[in-house]
């Protein structure tokens, strides 16, 4: 079996930065305890489990405000997906120490929404409902930001001005965003468009589109909650024309997927730990359909290998 290792794949700089920020927080004895992450720091359970070993508690819930209601003291880390001004204010009112790990690309979108609101615009924001990134973006200006996920959402959308900005969640499929933007332009011809697919997401999607077409199967390594991982599987199927499965780690690979397969493409979401992806590739490289000794699929990567290394600051 030939393995096509799609490149680039895996961690983006925003994810690494967020994890380093959280790791440094865990090592900072001056921060009030307990230390909480407001939702998953990045959408990968292996990462949140590793942080739990570091003493950092991940809390989840229907919204960031709902999660904050569970916290009465300590330190709160805002995730890479960003939060609304209301969340920041609520944390301040509760007397919590806050650390912001928002991805710079997300911050750029928030700044754009604020600037356009000041100019009297309404904003159409293309994103996944019930995902934390759109929650934070809509929360920048909930009175003028309209979240849409599908073309059907446009049918009932009415905006009381011709000053309209269209932007999007950074981890969406660029092809889905393009199709929706074309539909929006037909309904709102005066709209201005700012496509905000982050570069890391874009190049990973384009790599799958160009490299997965030679494979019989694509395996995307990523958490089920990771939007960018799910979009990579979608790109493989819809753009490259190659059947794809998303797995959290090697243990989720089903042997029947590999029957009759000669070429397997492997990629990983931007929040997927590199050792988890390497373990998937190593399994596929040694797999022999005629040898049951090669069929074992058990995650063996220790959690302490998941998080980035950071230097412990010496006290002066």
From Swiss-Prot:
Pathway(s) it belongs to: Isoprenoid biosynthesis; dimethylallyl diphosphate biosynthesis; dimethylallyl diphosphate from (2E)-4-hydroxy-3-methylbutenyl diphosphate: step 1/1; Isoprenoid biosynthesis; isopentenyl diphosphate biosynthesis via DXP pathway; isopentenyl diphosphate from 1-deoxy-D-xylulose 5-phosphate: step 6/6
UniProt cross-references to InterPro entries, sorted A to Z: LytB/IspH
Cofactor(s) the protein requires to work: [4Fe-4S] cluster
Keywords: 4Fe-4S, Iron, Iron-sulfur, Isoprene biosynthesis, Metal-binding, Oxidoreductase
Biological-process GO terms, alphabetical: dimethylallyl diphosphate biosynthetic process; isopentenyl diphosphate biosynthetic process, methylerythritol 4-phosphate pathway; terpenoid biosynthetic process
Keyword GTP-binding: no
Residues of the active site: 133 (proton donor)
Cofactor note (record): Binds 1 [4Fe-4S] cluster per subunit.
Domain of life: Bacteria
Binding site for (2E)-4-hydroxy-3-methylbut-2-enyl diphosphate: 43, 81, 131, 170, 226, 228, 271
Reactions accelerated catalytically: isopentenyl diphosphate + 2 oxidized [2Fe-2S]-[ferredoxin] + H2O = (2E)-4-hydroxy-3-methylbut-2-enyl diphosphate + 2 reduced [2Fe-2S]-[ferredoxin] + 2 H(+); dimethylallyl diphosphate + 2 oxidized [2Fe-2S]-[ferredoxin] + H2O = (2E)-4-hydroxy-3-methylbut-2-enyl diphosphate + 2 reduced [2Fe-2S]-[ferredoxin] + 2 H(+)
Enzyme class of the recorded protein, top EC level: oxidoreductase
One Pfam family from the record: LYTB
Membrane-traversing stretches: none
Sites where the protein binds [4Fe-4S] cluster: 12, 103, 198
Gene3D superfamilies registered for this protein in UniProt: 3.40.50.11270, 4-hydroxy-3-methylbut-2-enyl diphosphate reductase, catalytic domain
UniProt: isopentenyl diphosphate binding residues: 43, 81, 131, 226, 228, 271
The protein's Enzyme Commission number: 1.17.7.4
Residues annotated as binding dimethylallyl diphosphate: 43, 81, 131, 226, 228, 271
HAMAP family listed in its UniProt record: IspH
PANTHER family per record: 4-HYDROXY-3-METHYLBUT-2-ENYL DIPHOSPHATE REDUCTASE (PTHR30426:SF0)
Similarity field: Belongs to the IspH family.
Protein name: 4-hydroxy-3-methylbut-2-enyl diphosphate reductase
């Amino acid at each position: 079996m030939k393995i096509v290792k799609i490149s680039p794949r895996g961690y983006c700089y925003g994810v690494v930065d967020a994890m380093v920020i959280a790791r440094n927080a865990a090592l900072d004895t001056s921060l009030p305890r307990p230390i909480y992450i407001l939702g998953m720091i990045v959408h990968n359970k292996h990462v949140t489990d590793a942080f739990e070993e570091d003493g950092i508690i991940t809390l989840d819930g229907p919204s960031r405000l709902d999660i904050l209601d569970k916290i009465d003291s300590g330190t709160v880390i805002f995730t890479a997906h960003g939060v609304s001004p209301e969340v920041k204010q609520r944390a301040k009112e509760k007397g919590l120490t806050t650390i912001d790990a928002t991805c710079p690309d997300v911050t750029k979108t928030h700044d754009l929404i604020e600037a356009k609101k000041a100019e009297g615009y309404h904003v159409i924001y293309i994103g996944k409902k019930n995902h934390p990134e759109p929650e934070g973006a809509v929360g920048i200006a909930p009175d003028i930001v309209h979240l849409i996920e599908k073309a059907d959402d446009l049918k009932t959308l009415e905006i009381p001005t011709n000053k309209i900005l269209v932007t999007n969640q950074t981890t969406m499929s660029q092809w889905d965003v393009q199709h929706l933007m074309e539909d929006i332009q037909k309904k709102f011809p005066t709209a201005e468009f700012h496509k905000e697919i982050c570069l890391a997401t874009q190049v990973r999607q384009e790599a799958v589109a160009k490299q997965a077409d030679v494979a019989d199967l694509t395996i995307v390594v990523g958490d089920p909650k990771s939007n960018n991982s799910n979009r990579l599987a979608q790109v493989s199927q819809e753009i490259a024309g190659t059947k794809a499965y998303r797995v959290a780690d090697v243990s989720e690979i089903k042997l029947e997927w590999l029957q009759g397969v000669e070429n397997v493409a492997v990629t990983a979401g931007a929040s997927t730990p590199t050792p988890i992806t390497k373990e998937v590739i190593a399994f596929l490289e040694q797999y022999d359909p005629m040898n049951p000794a090669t069929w074992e699929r058990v995650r063996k990567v220790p959690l302490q290998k998941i998080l980035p290394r950071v230097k412990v600051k010496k006290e002066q």
